């Protein structure tokens, strides 16, 4: 395969996770032909110094890729700023990118899938990004495509193109309308009932997320993300070690799919399928109790951070 997208890996203070993620990436069939960019954020607190240095020891000895470019921040940028600036730098040079963070375990055919889809649908402007992750769901026997469209985004092993990325408004102007206009709130929730709560936390300053702002841009332009029918990644960060992922026994995860060598038969044109979308979004539907619990959680977080 030619015209491969570069891989971007963001790391911070988790040496064991970083090593595990790199080992999985190296087992990808296209790793040896791919350029890997690694962005290492500097320690925010003194207690993080040792782990950050251990991570940097690991990333400065990486092999198994066509080329490795390591960037080590001298001061702490924070997760959101690190990701936004890193992707912008690489994607403006290469035109597209595949992005992985230090808790995303990839299947051996992850890079093959991502490159195939990025190349296939680059000209389809209604597609905003590509995901390598999918939730556990009972796929109908009638569904034969390896991919489907949904309104939700994913930051668990994903890719996009320069033109889509550079359209993003990171200041999310007009965001208040999500909470004052019922129609817009309903449209925003097409990606999941959890998203308005995450978005409110971001805009209240109790969360610092690039991903929810990326979704806002996806929503505002009425675009889709391409998801694989079966997941090609597993998030190993639900152990309390991450910035945004705490401990969770019911993380929407799925074991990594390891089959390899099968040709990915992508349709020439993608159409939104309501049934597949309903199956997918059902993982993010809230009951009244869920909504009340989430509201109280965000209220408590807001009071603590005031």
Which ranges hold each PLM region?
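An acidic/histidine-cluster motif and surrounding catalytic segment
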Residues: 1-99, 104-306
């Amino acid at each position: 395969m030619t015209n491969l997208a570069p891989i971007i890996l963001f790391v911070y203070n988790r040496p064991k996770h970083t090593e595990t993620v790199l080992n999985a990436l190296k087992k990808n069939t296209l790793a040896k032909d791919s350029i890997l960019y690694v962005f290492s954020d500097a320690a925010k607190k003194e207690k993080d110094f040792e782990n950050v240095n251990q991570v940097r020891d690991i990333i400065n000895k990486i092999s198994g890729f066509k080329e490795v470019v390591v960037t080590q921040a001298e001061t702490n940028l924070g997760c959101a700023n690190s990701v936004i600036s890193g992707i912008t730098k690489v994607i403006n040079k290469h035109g597209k990118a595949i992005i992985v963070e230090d808790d995303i375990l990839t299947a051996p055919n992850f890079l093959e899938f991502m490159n195939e889809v990025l190349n296939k649908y680059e000209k389809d402007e209604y597609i905003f990004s590509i995901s390598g992750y999918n939730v556990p769901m009972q796929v109908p026997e009638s569904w034969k495509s390896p991919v489907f469209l949904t309104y939700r985004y994913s930051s668990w092993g994903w890719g996009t193109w320069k033109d889509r990325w550079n359209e993003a408004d990171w200041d999310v102007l007009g965001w208040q309308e999500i909470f004052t206009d019922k129609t817009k709130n309903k449209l925003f929730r097409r990606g999941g009932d959890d998203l308005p709560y995450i978005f409110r936390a971001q805009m209240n300053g109790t969360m610092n997320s690039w991903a929810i702002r990326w979704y806002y841009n996806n929503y505002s332009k009425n675009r889709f993300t391409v998801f694989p029918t079966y997941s090609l990644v597993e998030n190993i960060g639900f152990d309390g070690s991450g910035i945004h992922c705490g401990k969770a026994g019911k993380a929407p995860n799925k074991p990594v799919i390891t089959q390899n060598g099968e040709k990915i038969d992508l349709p020439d044109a993608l159409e939104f399928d309501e049934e597949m979308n309903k199956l997918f979004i059902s993982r993010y539907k809230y009951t009244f109790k869920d909504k009340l619990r989430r509201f109280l959680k965000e209220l408590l977080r807001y009071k603590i951070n005031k």
